[in-house]
């Protein structure tokens, strides 16, 4: 099976890279082993919230020079040696909008998103259904009704309301009861956001839901709900807003995250619409190399039939997605045994303080400035690495996980397009 480009991994980075390549007419295949981290996403995407020294960042693009001094191995720092990162960021934003996603935010300045705990976190882009506020301004609401769903344990309205009250907002907490959910509620293991959304999205349940929300929010100017409506798109929520006559925003729940799934579905639909091929439930097990080039990939489902392409992209994720594997005494990349940025002594991999930055989160594949992975200190000619498999950054402490995924995806796609044009 022959393609122009094969991408290993179907998460945010892999899909974004595939979309950009397919938009330029490249025939791409994505080998995806299963659920990716987007299913755990809040629906907001971070670009850069903190520098490695802990300094807060309000304008991400203005902080890149300081980041390069503090973290020269950071993917942003490497990409800045080759191109303008602001151009990659702008293209990433445009790519998401071409996928039909309604997003708010800008790289010029971070904004605040409301978390399921009622606190605020800085971020870059958010789905339009998520409650957001200016970075340095007051929260834009005075009276808020936080409404959970009776029997739904993955969202606690009292916790959100209490945190909002601490910020000077008149917030109330209540639970709605909808008879349409009673049968689902009888099985707690099935009473999850996705299954609830399938019921709440039905047109026949809209008016009863609107009546219940109106009853519980009579004095509120805005309603906060758990993200349990609008499974595929926001149209059911828009229709509910029209009936209730008030703004209704969604807060993420425990996984699986409906907002993250909506992101994934939009990206995957765009990729397939452009002619890309997704191989779900498959995994690349090994690679065939001649000199310093990959000539074939062998996957679990295709056995001895090699997958061939002129260019390969490694977007296999970090430990969560098995793109990196940890044994008792080492970290390794399982397909090609690529060079890894890590620490030699296991005792140094983590800190006893759970809330301190954890060193292992910065472990990942080592690359050159073109994001070509190193193997024995030498860059492979036709392989690039993108997203969470890369080393040199802490996506949690620095608040840059989605930004690295999207910018590295666009960066590598543009390099591949240029290289293939020269080859032709």
UniProtKB/Swiss-Prot annotation:
Catalytic activity: a quinone + sn-glycerol 3-phosphate = dihydroxyacetone phosphate + a quinol
Keyword Oxidoreductase carried by entry: yes
EC numbers for this chain: 1.1.5.3
Co-factor requirement: FMN
A GO BP entry: glycerol catabolic process
Gene3D superfamilies assigned to the protein according to its UniProt record, in alphabetical order: FAD/NAD(P)-binding domain
Pathway: Polyol metabolism; glycerol degradation via glycerol kinase pathway; glycerone phosphate from sn-glycerol 3-phosphate (anaerobic route): step 1/1
Keywords: Flavoprotein, FMN, Oxidoreductase
InterPro entries assigned to the protein according to its UniProt record, in alphabetical order: FAD-dep_OxRdtase_2_FAD-bd, FAD/NAD-bd_sf, G3P_DH_GlpB_su
Transmembrane segments: none
Task of the protein: Conversion of glycerol 3-phosphate to dihydroxyacetone. Uses fumarate or nitrate as electron acceptor.
Family the UniProt entry places it in: Belongs to the anaerobic G-3-P dehydrogenase subunit B family.
HAMAP family: Glycerol3P_GlpB (MF_00753)
PANTHER family: 4,4'-DIAPONEUROSPORENE OXYGENASE (PTHR43734:SF7), PHYTOENE DESATURASE (PTHR43734)
Name under which the protein is recorded: Anaerobic glycerol-3-phosphate dehydrogenase subunit B
Organism: Yersinia pestis
């Amino acid at each position: 099976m022959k393609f122009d480009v094969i991408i290993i991994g179907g998460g945010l980075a892999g899909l974004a890279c595939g979309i950009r390549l397919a938009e330029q007419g490249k025939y791409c295949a994505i080998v995806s082993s299963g659920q990716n981290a987007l299913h755990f996403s809040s629906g907001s995407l971070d670009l850069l919230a903190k520098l490695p020294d802990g300094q807060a960042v309000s304008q991400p693009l203005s902080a890149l020079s300081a980041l390069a001094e503090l973290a020269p191995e950071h993917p942003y720092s490497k990409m800045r040696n080759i191109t303008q990162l602001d151009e990659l960021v702008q293209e990433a934003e445009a790519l998401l909008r071409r996928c039909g996603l309604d997003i708010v935010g800008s790289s010029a300045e971070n904004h605040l998103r409301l978390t399921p705990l009622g606190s605020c976190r800085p971020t870059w882009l958010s789905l339009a259904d998520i409650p957001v506020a200016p970075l340095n301004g007051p929260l834009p609401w005075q009276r808020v009704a936080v409404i959970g769903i009776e029997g739904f344990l993955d969202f606690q309205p009292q916790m959100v309301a209490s945190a909002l009250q601490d910020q000077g907002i008149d917030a109330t907490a209540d639970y709605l009861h909808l008879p349409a959910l009673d049968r689902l509620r009888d099985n707690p293991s099935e009473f999850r956001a996705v299954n609830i959304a399938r019921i709440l999205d039905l047109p026949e349940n809209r008016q009863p839901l609107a009546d219940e929300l109106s009853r519980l929010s009579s004095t509120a100017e805005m309603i906060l709900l758990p993200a349990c409506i609008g499974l595929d798109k926001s149209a059911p929520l828009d229709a509910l807003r029209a009936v209730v006559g008030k703004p209704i925003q969604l807060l993420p729940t425990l996984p699986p995250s409906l907002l993250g799934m909506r992101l994934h579905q939009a990206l995957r639909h765009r990729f397939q619409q452009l002619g890309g091929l997704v191989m779900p439930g498959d995994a690349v097990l090994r690679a065939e190399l001649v000199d310093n080039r990959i000539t074939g990939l062998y996957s679990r489902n295709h056995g001895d039939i090699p997958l061939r392409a002129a260019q390969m992209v490694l977007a296999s994720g970090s430990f969560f997605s098995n793109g990196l594997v940890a044994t008792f005494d080492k970290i390794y990349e399982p397909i090609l045994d690529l060079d890894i940025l890590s620490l030699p002594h296991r005792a140094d991999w983590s800190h006893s303080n759970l809330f301190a930055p954890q060193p292992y989160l910065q472990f990942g594949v080592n690359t050159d400035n073109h994001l070509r992975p190193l193997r024995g200190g030498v860059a492979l000619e036709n392989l690039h690495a993108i997203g969470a498999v890369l080393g040199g950054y802490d996506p949690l402490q620095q608040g840059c996980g989605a930004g690295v995924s999207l910018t590295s995806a666009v960066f590598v796609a543009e390099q591949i397009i240029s290289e293939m044009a020269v080859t032709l």
